[in-house]
């Protein structure tokens, strides 16, 4: 008895597998196998369907992919059809420079993406583009300085003038400062004995003459404020006698005002030389220790003048001393 074939064997064969070639390789094979190395779009379709059973069935999508690859890849060149030959559609051929697109002629391996080289017509454009930057960067030999001046508007080396240097400015300062300070420096009074000796004028005139001070409450004279300037910048024009006497008067005033020890005043008086005469004047004598009374005279001098409260004074009649204050009347 003969066995009947199984239904599985009667079933159609399995679906063919897709070939391992890209669409570019399929198009290249179709063009190379056609006469004249050129083929139309319909001829490419027929070649692919006749060789590979996978594309025989009308599967949508692959034909559109063939058209896209023909138009997008530069290795395929479109050649217009001759009017003398009947038919419709243009021919497609391979670019002559794409012979090495596949390795060893194998369509399975594509070497690299093909880029179309510039032809005879395309060389004119790049040549102009190349010449334009060459003209811009290579100036005429006759005018090299103008281009360098445009590129660098500022001079490369700027001379440093001596007048603007720091040393030049500081070198000229001492001369100017010395002349300015000598003019602005306050001149000390040449006759300091006038402040420490009695005058024939009344108390009101003496107070007006000796009281233009910034501290009217304490009655400091303007000469008292110059004590620091005298120690810092001595004036060569003042005699040593006048300097010593003025310094003694100022220190006496300061000591009486601040209430220091009277023993220091004897040291100050003894340290000051008096080249004028051997006997000290009334202004140079050491003051006597003062009691704690409210108002007392300094020293009994040779010019007794009636004060405001009836006390005889040895120094200017307008000077009085209280335990915490020294003022002019």
Swiss-Prot record:
Compositional bias segments (type: Polar residues): 175-184
Disruption phenotype: Accumulation of blood in the central part of the fetal testis. Increased ectopic apoptosis in periendothelial cells of the testis.
Chain residue ranges for the region called Disordered: 117-150, 174-213
Principal cellular location given in the protein's record: nucleus
Transmembrane segment boundaries: none
Keyword Secreted in record: no
Domain of life: Eukaryota
Annotated InterPro entries: FH_FOXS1 (IPR047364), Fork_head_dom (IPR001766), FOX_domain-containing (IPR050211), TF_fork_head_CS_1 (IPR018122), TF_fork_head_CS_2 (IPR030456), WH-like_DNA-bd_sf (IPR036388), WH_DNA-bd_sf (IPR036390)
A Pfam family annotated for this UniProt entry: Forkhead
UniProt KW keywords: DNA-binding, Nucleus, Repressor, Transcription, Transcription regulation
Portion annotated as DNA-binding: 17-108
Gene Ontology CC: one annotated term: nucleus
GO molecular function: DNA binding; DNA-binding transcription repressor activity, RNA polymerase II-specific; RNA polymerase II cis-regulatory region sequence-specific DNA binding
Compartment(s) of residence: Nucleus
Gene Ontology BP, a term: blood vessel development
Coiled-coil intervals, chain numbering: none
CDD domains (UniProt xref): FH_FOXS1
Biological role: Transcriptional repressor that suppresses transcription from the FASLG, FOXO3 and FOXO4 promoters. May have a role in the organization of the testicular vasculature.
Protein name as catalogued: Forkhead box protein S1
Lineage of origin: Eukaryota, Metazoa, Chordata, Craniata, Vertebrata
Gene assigned in the entry: Foxs1
């Amino acid at each position: 008895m003969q066995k009947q074939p199984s239904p599985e064997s009667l079933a159609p064969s399995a679906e063919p597998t897709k070939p391992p070639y890209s669409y570019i390789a399929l198009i290249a094979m179709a063009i190379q196998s056609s006469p004249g190395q050129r083929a139309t779009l319909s001829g490419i379709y027929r070649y692919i369907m006749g060789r590979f059973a996978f594309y025989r069935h009308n599967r949508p999508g692959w034909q559109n992919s063939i058209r896209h690859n023909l138009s997008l890849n530069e290795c395929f060149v479109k050649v217009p059809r001759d009017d003398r030959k009947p038919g419709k559609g243009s021919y497609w051929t391979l670019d002559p420079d794409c012979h090495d697109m596949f390795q060893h002629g194998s369509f399975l391996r594509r070497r690299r993406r093909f880029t179309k080289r510039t032809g005879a017509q395309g060389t004119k454009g790049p040549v102009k583009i190349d010449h334009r930057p060459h003209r811009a960067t290579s100036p005429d030999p006759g005018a090299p300085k103008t281009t360098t001046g445009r590129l660098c508007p500022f001079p490369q080396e700027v001379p440093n003038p001596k007048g603007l240097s720091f040393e030049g400015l500081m070198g000229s300062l001492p001369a100017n400062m010395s002349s300015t300070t000598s003019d602005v420096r306050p001149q000390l009074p040449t006759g300091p004995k006038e402040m420490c000796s009695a005058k024939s004028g009344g108390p009101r005139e003496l107070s007006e003459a000796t009281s233009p001070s910034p501290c009217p409450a304490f009655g400091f004279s303007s000469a008292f404020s110059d004590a620091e300037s005298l120690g810092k910048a001595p004036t060569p024009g003042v005699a040593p006698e006048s300097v010593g006497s003025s310094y003694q008067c100022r220190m006496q005033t300061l000591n009486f005002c601040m209430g220091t020890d009277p023993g220091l005043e004897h040291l100050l008086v003894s340290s000051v030389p008096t080249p004028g005469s051997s006997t000290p004047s009334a202004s140079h004598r050491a003051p006597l220790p003062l009691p704690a009374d409210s108002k007392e005279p300094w020293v009994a001098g040779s010019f007794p003048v009636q004060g405001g409260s009836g006390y005889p004074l040895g120094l200017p009649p307008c000077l009085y001393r209280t335990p915490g204050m020294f003022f002019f009347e």
